[in-house]
Amino acid sequence: MKNISKGKILIPEEVIPIKDHQTISKKLVDLYDLHILLMSLDQNTDVSPEFFAEERLYFVLKGELKFNNEKLLNNELILFEKNKLFGIEAREKSIFLEIAVDLEEDEMKNIEKGKKIKLTNCLDYVEGGIANIDLVSKDEFKVFLMAFDAGEGLKPHKAPGDALVMALEGKAKLLVGEKEIEIQSGEQIVFPANVIHNVTAITRFKMLLILSIDK
């Protein structure tokens, strides 16, 4: 990933500004078959309706957006299938992720196309355990949710690509290389590729993880 700091806590407004009457975008991933944009829209601005040749996934980090007839708030997500006409309207000053990726039907998991999803409602906590559920699964790109009971965690490990973590609920302690960091709901962090990291829940903790492997 580029244009975003790695291994430190991120606040959306510190990564991309919201400016009066403007639409702003930053490329985080720009590959032939995958792009991830971080975008901001000022209140009462819009992106005109368009058709796209690949699936589009949107995740709201701040504000209120309207996609056709679906209103999305913080921590809500929507997936549009290819060749579907839709536009984006900002009801408030807003920041969101746009992911464009070509998907086969079996690579879209546990997600209804064209309908908003409140991510914290998609996965229940398991007492004394960790639960996860895939939303998108390709060899080089994955999007999934995880729910940790308080005190539960992953063993330190490395990933073959950068992983963007979005804290949805609760608080956790992270290891990134030799640094320990705390993260809480509303914050994000990028785990750098091939760097030891882990997650240990301080309270019950839910997160969305986006993993991109640049082959």
Residue ranges and their predicted role:
Residues 61-62, 92, 168-169, 184-185, ...:
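A cytosolic small-molecule/anion-sensing beta-strand core signal
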Residues 69-85, 177-194:
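Short acidic-glycine-tyrosine-enriched beta hairpin
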Residues 71-73, 82-106, 193-215:
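Ligand-binding loop in jelly-roll beta-barrel domains
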